[in-house]
């Protein structure tokens, strides 16, 4: 049976339309995709290889006197793997003080294309619904979860490097 016919069979008092039924199915599929360790591994690998550190000045803070110590990072982007610990820590401080927006992420379109080839099997109406769920799973669930992991990992690494530099300087 086609997708619409199948969705019609789920219409109830709570699920009042085909679109509601399809959205419910997509939400369930998005959760399955989010919990798939292979999918999460692919996203993690893309973060490891291609994540960019991106900072922007927080809205309304461009002219703030206190924010000027972070002005180098008002519009900054560089590969996470190349970002020195002192710079990463400065950006994080700018975020904590409310002057910067700080994100770590690879190119969304690249990841979504890789995931599409991995997850979508076929070219029909059902595959189209899975593709919509996949995009939602990445944008709403997976991306922020993996970014949170990489924020923590990069912070721990930067803290460790900063301590090593401090100890080295004490010994000199």
Where does each model-flagged region fall?
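Duplex nucleic acid-engaging cores and interfaces of nucleic-acid transaction enzymes
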Residues: 1-172
């Amino acid at each position: 049976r086609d997708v619409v016919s199948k969705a019609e069979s789920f219409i109830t008092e709570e699920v009042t339309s085909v679109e509601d039924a399809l959205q419910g199915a997509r939400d369930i599929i998005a959760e399955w995709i989010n919990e798939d360790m292979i999918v999460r591994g692919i996203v993690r690998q893309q973060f490891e290889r291609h994540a960019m550190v991106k900072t922007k000045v927080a809205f309304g803070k461009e002219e703030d006197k206190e924010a000027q110590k972070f002005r180098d990072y008002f519009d900054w982007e560089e590969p996470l793997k190349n970002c020195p610990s002192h710079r990463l820590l400065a950006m994080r401080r700018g975020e904590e003080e409310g002057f910067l927006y700080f994100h770590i992420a690879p190119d969304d379109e690249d990841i979504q294309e890789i995931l599409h080839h991995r997850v979508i099997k076929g070219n029909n109406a059902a595959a189209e619904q899975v593709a919509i769920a996949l995009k939602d799973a990445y944008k709403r669930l997976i991306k922020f979860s993996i970014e949170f992991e990489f924020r923590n990992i990069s912070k721990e690494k930067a803290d460790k490097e900063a301590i090593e530099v401090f100890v080295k300087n004490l010994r000199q």
